Amino acid sequence: MKRVLVFTHDTFGLGHVRRSLHIVRALCRRLPDAAVLVASGSPALRAVRDLPPNADFVKLPTIVRTGAPGSQPPHLPLELREVTALRASMLCAAVDAYRPDLLLVDNFPLGSRRELLGVLPRARQLGARTVLGLRDIVDRPEIVRASWTKDGVYDALQQLYDLVLVYGVREILDAGAAYGLSSSLQARVRYCGYVTAGRGALRDAAELRRELGVEETLVVATVGGGGDGFPLLRSFVQAVRMLRGLTAVVVTGPLMAPGERDRIRELAVGHAGITVTEYVADLPSYLAAADAVVAMGGYNTVAELLALKQRALVLPRDWRYGDFAHGTGPTVEWEQLLRGQALERLGLLRVLPRECFEPKALAAHLADALTAAGALAQRGRAPIADIDVDGAERAADELVHLLQSEGCHVH
């Protein structure tokens, strides 16, 4: 029986956990007799109800990013270094007791504060193959290169990883070249495509629109987990109130602060066409039925929109988590903006300018997009270019192949 250990980091939001669980499900379908253990500090693990029967998780003490550089443990009254040491010891204990055949690490080659520096060699010493999964875009290439050089990531990649899976496509970013990987490391890189929940059956769009009472136009706004989504949804609700004939569904996500969610609901009071909800069980059906979607530029949200071929209006977050008060300054977080710009160049979505955090500007852009969408509908919807959204399946195939292959570790 093969044993797989998946480590997913618990930075603010749900993206890393959701992406990892999509891959876990695809892997478990291929290896129903394998054991798959997920280790993370993400609070989102507590809400997971649909793990495969041959999978389970280990909850680590949580570390989340804050608006300022660095991280802080949100629950245990311990110093960050103590929580980091505790997490590292728990992971080492899991490796020793579980003895995985494969260790998959999500996006952070050394974990938080280098907590995997002892875990990876121990896993390999016990015979595990080790794989790093990278987001389509980590950050600006020059920032990644500087950070990886400072933290010793290049040496770790060379010595401690057998394979690097990129959860994106080379047309968006050639990670090997952009991040300065050596030729031997680039030979270990596999582009898997975007990781999504898969192509499940969608509800009938006309039926869903009738259920929502849509008379003219349906607009859906979604901000992923929602922890950083308040500025966009605040602007969106006020923008909808400036336009006529709109039915709007506003999905705040489970991580939005209760006070912020209450404020969004207050802004919607008196407008019968605006529904504010924390969660929608079948969000893809709502996105597919909408005349327009307004979203942030996080990985999971964008990947699902690509899978649906829904041309969304995307307003990327370019400030640090919790730091929107300073969001009028220069861009300090590049991931969402770079992703949006690259996909916009391919005609797959439309990036909104930062001014759309003001309701009047967002209302103008939304009205323009709906007018354009109406014109397209009258003359036939223009086809949207295909982009690979089978990342979970292809990543699972790569992992199975590595598990079944013979030979020593790559160095």
Residue ranges and their predicted role:
Residues 194-292, 337, 355-356:
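Donor-nucleotide binding loops and adjacent catalytic segments primarily
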Residues 6-8, 26-82, 86-93:
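Conserved nucleotide-sugar phosphate-binding/catalytic loop shared by glycosyltransferases and other
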Residues 8-21, 44-47, 230:
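A short, glycine/small-residue-rich beta-strand->loop->alpha-helix junction that serves as a flexible
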Residues 90-158:
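Conserved nucleotide-sugar donor-interacting segment of glycosyltransferase catalytic cores
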Residues 364, 370-411:
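C-terminal amphipathic helix plus adjacent low-complexity
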Residues 282-338:
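A donor-sugar binding/catalytic signature common to diverse glycosyltransferases
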Residues 135-230, 258:
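A nucleotide-sugar donor-handling region in carbohydrate enzymes
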